[in-house]
Amino acid sequence: MRNRDEFAEWAEVHGHLYGTPARALEGALGRGLDVLLDIDTHGARQLRQRYPEAVSVFIMAPSLAELEARLRERNSDAPREIHRRLARAREEIAAWRQYDYLIINRDVKEAVDQLAAIIQAERCRTGRLTLKFPDVEVPE
């Protein structure tokens, strides 16, 4: 699929290949759905190139120390893997200005509320709306 350009984006992350099939993404968008993708900075860059109208949100922990504590708390990664993830996080954090929005995840509920607010605001952008008023001519 990768060689046939069937992915909207793809990346190798922590030794694993991930990708978003373009057909599935475009089908969901064509049905008017909001689509959320959990992708790295390389995938986000690919999406912006292929879909310039895409909205990007960078979500990060309040600090690298907090991220490390969360990774250790999960108790699912070996110390070497945690070290690798922290190094990758440093690289990704450096790219935060390439995104449309930034959420600092201090509290899960607050982060979810902020993401919901972004989605709602984006739905209201005039460039995304098609209005039909029977008594008013609205130029397109």
Question: For each of these PLM feature ranges, what is it?
Answer:
Residues 1-35, 41-45:
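ATP-dependent small-molecule kinase phosphotransfer cores
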Residues 46, 66, 110:
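Phosphate- and divalent-cation-binding pockets in alpha/beta enzyme and binding domains
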Residues 79-88:
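Glycine-rich S-adenosyl-L-methionine
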Residues 35-40, 49-74, 105:
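Conserved phosphate-donor/acceptor-positioning beta-strand/loop module used by diverse small-molecule
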Residues 4-8, 70-77, 118-121:
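Conserved AAA+ ATPase "sensor/coupling" helix adjacent to the nucleotide-binding pocket
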Residues 27-30, 48-52, 94-96:
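Conserved catalytic network of the ASCE P-loop NTPase/AAA+ motor domain
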Residues 53, 76-77, 91-140:
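NTP-dependent small-molecule kinase module
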